[in-house]
Amino acid sequence: MGSVSNQQFAGGCAKAAEEAPEEAPEDAARAADEPQLLHGAGICKWFNVRMGFGFLSMTARAGVALDPPVDVFVHQSKLHMEGFRSLKEGEAVEFTFKKSAKGLESIRVTGPGGVFCIGSERRPKGKSMQKRRSKGDRCYNCGGLDHHAKECKLPPQPKKCHFCQSISHMVASCPLKAQQGPSAQGKPTYFREEEEEIHSPTLLPEAQN
């Protein structure tokens, strides 16, 4: 009977092995596609604060020194820090990264020991701020260039044309603005008068003689 029991046991094991589910091809492909996280350390090679990305110079991988260093792409969204996220050139970092079709890409970037990154002192200059500065700030109450209307010390002034300073009409219906060419539009009358006086031949000594 012992031999019969052994045969039954062997047969049961074989049957169990046959019934064991095999790994689906989809699961195997998914496991192969999942990025393998690697650990590295190094410094920030460069970082563009306006674009929000740069490259790390990896000097060690999994505790093993690399010579020469290897570049690893970094995006601001991967930085472990508060507030505006950026990196300072030469800043020491630790990070996890993966291999992609484009190269090495960082997954999470911290300072040494997992602390917050220091970040760059630079801040991007917004286009809206540059446009606002180029046009200049003007007080809509008195026309002054050194303050805003809310800071004006004069009482409320009557509304007037910002082009010729006349109170009889607004800038949209200004006859002088309509007569001027595109190059003169946007310049108040007193600016144009000063330019005309500067370029007038009556002020030149040769013309007076």
Curated annotation (Swiss-Prot):
Gene Ontology MF: a single term: sequence-specific mRNA binding
Outcome of swapping H147A: Abolishes ability to suppress pre-let-7 biogenesis and localization to P-bodies without affecting pre-let-7 binding
One GO CC term, this protein: nucleolus
CDD domains found in the cross-reference section: CSP_CDS
UniProt modified residues of type Phosphoserine: S3, S120, S200
Taxonomy, superkingdom: Eukaryota
Domain CSD: 39-112
GO annotation terms (biological process): cellular response to glucose stimulus; germ cell development; miRNA catabolic process; negative regulation of glial cell differentiation; negative regulation of pre-miRNA processing; negative regulation of translation; positive regulation of cell proliferation involved in kidney development; positive regulation of cytoplasmic translation
Induction: Can be negatively regulated by the interaction of microRNAs miR-125a and miR-125b with at least two miRNA responsive elements (miREs) in the 3'-UTR of this gene. These interactions may reduce both translation efficiency and mRNA abundance. Negatively regulated by retinoic acid.
Keyword Heme: no
Modified residues (N-acetylglycine): G2
Effect of H169A: Abolishes ability to suppress pre-let-7 biogenesis and localization to P-bodies without affecting pre-let-7 binding
Protein purpose: RNA-binding protein that inhibits processing of pre-let-7 miRNAs and regulates translation of mRNAs that control developmental timing, pluripotency and metabolism. Seems to recognize a common structural G-quartet (G4) feature in its miRNA and mRNA targets. 'Translational enhancer' that drives specific mRNAs to polysomes and increases the efficiency of protein synthesis. Its association with the translational machinery and target mRNAs results in an increased number of initiation events per molecule of mRNA and, indirectly, in mRNA stabilization.
Binding partners and assembly: Monomer. During skeletal muscle differentiation, associated with translation initiation complexes in the polysomal compartment. Directly interacts with EIF3S2. Interacts with NCL in an RNA-dependent manner. Interacts (via C-terminus) with DHX9 (via N- and C-terminus); this interaction occurs in a RNA-independent manner. Interacts with TUT4 in the presence of pre-let-7 RNA.
Similarity comment: family membership: Belongs to the lin-28 family.
Domains as described in the record: The CSD domain is required for function in muscle differentiation. The CCHC zinc fingers interact with the GGAG motif at the 3' end of let-7 miRNAs precursors, more generally they bind the 5'-NGNNG-3' consensus motif with micromolar affinity. The CSD domain recognizes the loop at the 5' end. The flexible linker allows accommodating variable sequences and lengths among let-7 family members.
Note: Overexpressed in primary tumors (overall frequency approximately 15%), overexpression being linked to repression of let-7 family miRNAs and derepression of let-7 targets. Facilitates cellular transformation in vitro, and overexpression is associated with advanced disease across multiple tumor types. Reactivation of LIN28A expression enhances tissue repair in some adult tissues by reprogramming cellular bioenergetics. Improves hair regrowth by promoting anagen in hair follicle and accelerates regrowth of cartilage, bone and mesenchyme after ear and digit injuries.
The protein, known as: Protein lin-28 homolog A
Species name: Homo sapiens
